[in-house]
Amino acid sequence: MKGGNYTSLGTCSGINVSGNVAGTRKMSLGKSIKMYLTIFILTTCIYMALYQYHISREPFAASEVVKHQEKSSSYIASYLWSPISLLMANSSSNTNNNSTTTSTTTTTAPTTPTTTTTTTVGSVGQKLGASSISSIRMVSLAATIPSFKSTLSESRSVSLGGHQKTATVKTSTTITTRTTASGLATTKLSATTRTTAKTSAKLSAATTPTASHMENGYKTRPTFVAASLPPPLYIITPTYRRPEQLAELTRLGYTLKHVVNLLWLVIEDANKTNPLVGHTLDRIGVPYEYMVAPMPEKYKQTKKAKPRGVSNRNRGLEYLREHATEGVLYFADDDNTYDISIFEQMRYISKVAMWPVGLVTKTGVSSPIIQAGKLVGYYDGWIGGRKYPVDMAGFAVSVKFLKERPNAQMPFKPGYEEDGFLRSLAPLDDAEIELLADECRDILTWHTQTKKNAPAQALNRTRYKNTNLEHIDRLLVRP
């Protein structure tokens, strides 16, 4: 009996000991879990505090072009609930920047935009209408969707430029835009018309965000949209064969090259085109039409002053009536000097505009007289009974205004070419004449004259055979 009791008591004692051990283990496990949770929470808070401190230390980029990025809720949650992501913030950010995010480079230029030029030479047999000409001029605006759409007018080249600040933005996931400094397409008119379009525009846009870009929750807003070109300019330049011809065309051409949306009508007083002139125009790169318009024989034979350049200018007027719809025409002689700002001023006129011209007659200037903002007369060294005693370089006319007067042309009357042409634009009131160049208080064009040079003597081909002089001699213009 005692032995049985002893056994029974031993069994109960063993049970109690086992229960105490199990309870102790549960308490230790609970304390461990609490400790680990506490450490985890403290570690997370420390990581978050360090990350916020790191973000606050990063400087903001002071750029003219700001790419705004929005983070989705899933993107933010990944940082709140994953302490590992806090450690990988810098590395993942660098990786994403290389693959999916937008990298922006801003370049400021005083006069010309950053461009990539693609050259195309050819003839375009279509009419030139400014209303259908379009281009991609970079304008700092904000959009709401990561897409970009633009169209180019069919078979018409375009231009970009202007005196403004521009920014070049390279975006690997949204937009990649390249533009060129280009000109207008020209129209082949007849067998004697030669056309060369020197430059064209190229547009490449990635309009669909990548999959990884969408997964990360980024919403990048493009900052550039398309804008139309300014009204076109039609520059009519009469020329004739002489030793200074190529030099003067080169000087004028490189002036016009700084003007956007321009077509240069070069019209020679000859029966056929000159390959040297065509070569020079090709090299300059300004969009042009090269035509011929010989002076009528009855004026060539006269011993009096000849009406030079009249047939050329009238030929240019015929071209505009046939091909142009709007814009502004301007008679630019190849020996004059021009401030390019006058071209930007004249392109927005509605009818007729005038301004002073320097180096004219004994007065040194030919100009409208302005009093209290109104045209009250003309100042010129030779009035000669003219209603409009102005220089050829001192006025411009709207193409639309010209086409409303189909009989307007320049008379074959030496000294009265400008006056006769402006009279043919009647009805034209003085109040309708716009005053440019700071209301005629500034001089932006000059009637310069190149010194006449004697024709080059013939090359001794026997003495200089197989030398560079044989090639140079072909570039000399002899009457």
From Swiss-Prot:
It catalyses: 3-O-(beta-D-galactosyl-(1->3)-beta-D-galactosyl-(1->4)-beta-D-xylosyl)-L-seryl-[protein] + UDP-alpha-D-glucuronate = 3-O-(beta-D-GlcA-(1->3)-beta-D-Gal-(1->3)-beta-D-Gal-(1->4)-beta-D-Xyl)-L-seryl-[protein] + UDP + H(+). It is found in: Golgi apparatus membrane. It comes from the Eukaryota. Keywords: Glycoprotein, Golgi apparatus, Manganese, Membrane, Metal-binding, Signal-anchor, Transferase, Transmembrane, Transmembrane helix. One of its GO terms (biological process) is glycosphingolipid biosynthetic process. It is a single-pass type II membrane protein. Belongs to the glycosyltransferase 43 family. Involved in the biosynthesis of L2/HNK-1 carbohydrate epitope on both glycolipids and glycoproteins. Enzyme has a broad specificity. This is Galactosylgalactosylxylosylprotein 3-beta-glucuronosyltransferase P. It comes from Drosophila melanogaster (Fruit fly). The gene is GlcAT-P.
